[in-house]
Amino acid sequence: MKTVTVKDLVIGAGAPKIIVSLMAKDIARVKSEALAYRETDFDILEWRVDHFADLSNVESVMAAAKILRETMPEKPLLFTFRSAKEGGEQAISTEAYIALNRAAIDSGLVDMIDLELFTGDDQVKETVAYAHAHDVKVVMSNHDFHKTPEAEEIIARLRKMQSFDADIPKIALMPQSTSDVLTLLAATLEMQEQYADRPIITMSMAKTGVISRLAGEVFGSAATFGAVKKASAPGQISVNDLRTVLTILHQA
């Protein structure tokens, strides 16, 4: 399986990488939170742009991105607008969503974008090609905050992302039972062993799914999300605790 290198970070080798999400509503808070995050032990900074209030002003969005880049120049920056239908803060048209991601790519300020699988096949393929032409990596994602589908469906979605040339396929699912967590882990392992030719990220959410956020190195998930202050999804644990557990499992 090939790895993905962003800046000096090799994703898909060694312990799972820690991603933290910054969810500030305005430029002032972007700046203050970035300064606080800078003191934290993590690997990738995800900017959750759907929390940013002045979204219609592309210049304002990119000014905030510039602050993040300048505050943490060594950290890979993942630009994510999470749509309302997949658990995000704001609804957005497909056209505006694609335009926003293209603006981020054009800015030269971001290393990676998050692109939702179910945006529309043609739009997804075109945006992946556009990102790659500008040396920006793509995390292709799918989130279900209500249920966990069968393992076959989980694998099918991850394989579809791979077929669309995502650099890193990602899926996050809500368990209704502990067996749903096992379904996610089994699907992750099967994908990683039989189909994946690149790193994947998977997680089962809420308290029930916490084990999936810790056991990525065992089952085949290359990264996990930790909380600096407020969790961006149910079940996230603090980055310090997360690093401790990932290190223990890596060194065992």
From Swiss-Prot:
Active-site positions on this chain: 143 (proton donor/acceptor), 170 (schiff-base intermediate with substrate)
Reaction catalysed by this enzyme: 3-dehydroquinate = 3-dehydroshikimate + H2O
Domain of life: Bacteria
Keyword field: Amino-acid biosynthesis, Aromatic amino acid biosynthesis, Lyase, Schiff base
Pathway field: Metabolic intermediate biosynthesis; chorismate biosynthesis; chorismate from D-erythrose 4-phosphate and phosphoenolpyruvate: step 3/7
EC number: 4.2.1.10
CDD domains linked to this entry: DHQase_I
Residue stretches in coiled coil: none
One GO BP: chorismate biosynthetic process
GO terms of molecular function: 3-dehydroquinate dehydratase activity
Pfam families: DHquinase_I
Sites where the protein binds 3-dehydroquinate: 21, 46-48, 82, 213, 232, 236
Quaternary structure (record): Homodimer.
Family: Belongs to the type-I 3-dehydroquinase family.
Function: Involved in the third step of the chorismate pathway, which leads to the biosynthesis of aromatic amino acids. Catalyzes the cis-dehydration of 3-dehydroquinate (DHQ) and introduces the first double bond of the aromatic ring to yield 3-dehydroshikimate.
Protein's UniProt name: 3-dehydroquinate dehydratase
Native source organism of the sequence: Shigella dysenteriae serotype 1 (strain Sd197)
